[in-house]
């Protein structure tokens, strides 16, 4: 079987103005630039405006505006505005919002909102936290929502559809589950 192996690119210093001009196919162990966009990252990346990884990220990604990982992420995303990931394990830290389009395990910390399509085990802290599907962990914020809550919600308004385990602590707590312990 003839498989084409990806090569390690190494450290890239990209001070290009076009985002697509900074694209590097293969593994990158480090990037620094205005717009960083390797195929796969195993290491650290610092993008002044954006830090985009098209497939997998293992490591640290820092961006002034937005971080985006098109595949699985294991590591830390820190940005000034927003972090977006398909799914993974680790920490997302931003001023405005964090988004995971599939189940996430770890910590999402933001001033405005955290959204995930499920939290395997984790912590969401923001003004508004949404865990579509299930939440196994803790949500702390003004508004907390989970489809299935196996954990705790601490906030002003806490909402869940099903509440098999855990506790809701807040001014208004709502659960459609009639057997939930409130």
Question: What annotation goes with each model-predicted range?
Answer:
Residues 2-10:
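Bacterial N-terminal signal peptides that target proteins for export
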